[in-house]
Amino acid sequence: MDLPDVAAVQHESRQLDLASSAAELHGGLCGWLSGGGADSADWLARILADTAQVAPAQGGALDQMRQATVAQLEDRDFAFELLLTEDGAPLPARTDALFDWCRAFLGGFGLAAQQRPALSEEGEEALQDLARLAQASSDDFDTAEEDDTALAEIEEFVRVAVLLLHGDCVMGPRFRQRLN
């Protein structure tokens, strides 16, 4: 299942008077789901920690984003993708979106996983690396082609880190439960 485009998510976000970008919303959702948070229609209120937040419209871009994200995280072919910026966005906008995504991921993950989730050693390292990325900014990059390549590598690292954390907190416990 494909993610909706960034413009559609941004449009619905503005309709709900949200100050969050598409990258932040997707990052928070991914963190929530990867930390073991429930796949439910009220996910937005949960990641924003705002019980008064209205649930996204069923079938709207935010709901499609939730459904696609759940499907991608559960996909055995590792088809998970990050929703960051529109194609062709300048490097500083793409780097800021990635780092915003990481900050939101950590927030959603913390809300869902609580104090000390049971993580593998690799999961602990991945979470620490995501925290370091969340502290970065586009000022750490130039506009050179090599920085474009570096950003693509960081995006791939983040994608794999999310799948690892989802595996530790969701897939692993689910598998162990089936064995019992």
UniProtKB/Swiss-Prot annotation:
It comes from the Bacteria. One of its GO terms (cellular component) is cytosol. Transmembrane segments: none annotated. InterPro entries: YgfB-like (IPR011978), YgfB-like_sf (IPR036255). HAMAP family: UPF0149 (MF_00346). Belongs to the UPF0149 family. This is UPF0149 protein XCC3260. It comes from Xanthomonas campestris pv. campestris (strain ATCC 33913 / DSM 3586 / NCPPB 528 / LMG 568 / P 25).
